[in-house]
Amino acid sequence: MVRKLYILLFILFLNFTVQAQTQTGKASYYSKKWTGRRTASGERIHHDSMTCAHRKYPFGTLLRVTNKKNGLQAIVRVNDRGPFDRGRIVDLSWGAAKAIGMLVAGVVPVTVERVDSVSSR
């Protein structure tokens, strides 16, 4: 019983540690053709929304995504799981991709960090 408690505490510790870190990697985005499909959270994809897919963060978490090539930022809400391509850390909605200026490139280097509220800077 004590062993199970230690394992649970260790898993919780790792989960909170990962969520507090800034991540660097590549972002891609959902094209408009995905509009209307359901995400892992059950929401429908809206191309103009400010949402994203992330492997670890809980649904509803707000993230600041910064395009490292041009410095543009967007605050997005996690509502899906992914990306499933190696080397990518976040999939953005079309609207979020437009906000950070990545529509032409398709895949760009980004930093991702958790924010407490939309007014966080």
Per-range role (PLM):
Residues 6-16:
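Hydrophobic helical h-region of N-terminal Sec-dependent signal peptides
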Residues 2-5, 18-121:
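Secreted/periplasmic proteins
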